[in-house]
Amino acid sequence: MTISDQDILFLGDCVREAARAEIMPRFRNLGADDVSEKTSATDLVTQADLLAEHRITAALKERFPSALIVGEEAYDADRSVVPALADAELAFVIDPVDGTFNFAAGLPVFGTILAVTVRGETVAGIIHDPVLGDTVTAIKGAGAFLTRQDGQSTKLKVAEPASLNQMVGGISWGHMEDPDRSRISANMAKIKMTFAFNCSAHEYWMVASGKLHFIGHAKLMPWDHLAGVLAHQEAGGHTAKFDGTPYRPGETTGGIISAPDKDSWQLIRREIIGN
């Protein structure tokens, strides 16, 4: 199964249309009944998430009727879909509103993510910023590109390697338990500056475009990471799980680090993740 250039254009249009029709009209316009907690007060779902995922899913089913479709919000109804990514002939993975906590709070740091996998390999990824209208598109073997709302396009490139005390990056330790949580958060004092966006879309956008040296996560849900990892790799970076093995569709544990190159990855693994 191959994905054509026309398919990529179609996927970009799907994401942008969902953002235009379902997400942005509800941004800073949510009622009390439009927001619900999933597992905690910081794990939310809104009507924008549900309706955007439904719109994208419907469009994908019409064009690719035999494909596996994995949506973050539909996952609770059928959790077998994530392991099935490991060998699905063709699959699409949707995060309709990545950064829902920010979205619900009225903070314009959220995105829509769509990844394409073929037989356990990510072959394309789209990360869209509904607020700015900008889109990152990554195609395996062809690079990663940022396309502005006005149509201007630039190829992405990761940051140059730097010494640890000059690095800017972030490790999401919210899903970690002690002692890992305390050790890693303390080790972040070794770098120049850290941050927390609470939004994988913008984190991968920043690290793939060279604005950050590294990012890391403990929880590996595919809608958060598949498209971003591909964009980072196509921009020249090195991404691997904490044990050094490649991150593959269907995997949800083991932690992940994205860095400018393998040497930088090993430095971060040793000095920041530790243990």
Feature roles, as predicted:
Residues A84-F145:
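DPxDG-like acidic metal-binding loop motif
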Residues L50, E73, P96-G99, P130, ...:
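Generic detector of well-ordered alpha-helical packing
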Residues M1-V97:
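N-terminal subdomain of lithium-sensitive/metallo-dependent phosphomonoesterases centered on the IMPase/IPPase/PAP
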Residues K157-N275:
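An extended, acidic
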Residues I23, D49, L60, T100, ...:
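Residue-level signal for inorganic ion chemistry
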Residues R63, T117-E121, V131, K140-G143, ...:
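Short loop segments at secondary-structure junctions
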